[in-house]
Amino acid sequence: HALVRRQRQMCIRDSKKIDRRLNFAFISDVHLGSNPTSHLEKICNEVMLLDVDYLLIGGDLFDTNSFQAHDLEPFLKLECPIYFVTGNHEYYVDGYKEKLEQLRRYNISILDNEVVSFSSINLVGVSDNQSEEKQIQITNALVTEEMYNVVIIHKPSIWEKVSQNVDLMLSGHTHKGQIFPFNFFVRLKFKNVYGLFEDGSNRLYVSSGSGTWGPRMRLGTQNEIVKISIQPI
């Protein structure tokens, strides 16, 4: 059942910064190349049914030289804007710069070390291809106190080290361990491996990912698509 997905829904209602409800879908670690385009097709079909305002992608969208830009065609059926940050695997692919540029042809905006603002929300993207120190510096520079700040970053390593103005951080990378015994090794490296973590009004969500890497199998974990609703108090 490696490519079976579940949907997880999360509602945040405690912020006075929000002036209207916004719905996001969050996916990560699709690993096109290792996984077939048909898997992405099914993901996009499910996202369409979720009725979201934005699709956010937390890195590792593709991972091998067998990936071709036309594998992204399922994204063209989505009417919502799509925002993407790089993970570690994109940089392992030959000609990755050109392939990243081709994402724009499929309505995907690359948000590495950039911010877009809409309504009362800052959507901040942080590239994986830099040191943690640089990631912390960029995150703190892009968030603002008066806006609700959603930060997308591939690895969940810096959450406790960044500004309290980061209201919600979305990450992937860990695959929740994917299969035994890798789950033990992942827990040794990352404090926050899967799920929702809270510190006052600050939150981190670490996804189990929407695909697999290496063995096309999962034991004790599932692929997922996450729907996040942020609402005013």
Feature names for model-found ranges:
Residues 1-12:
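Single conserved hydrophobic/aromatic residue that forms the stacking wall/gate
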Residues 16-233:
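Soluble catalytic domains of enzymes that build or remodel membrane lipids, polysaccharides, and related
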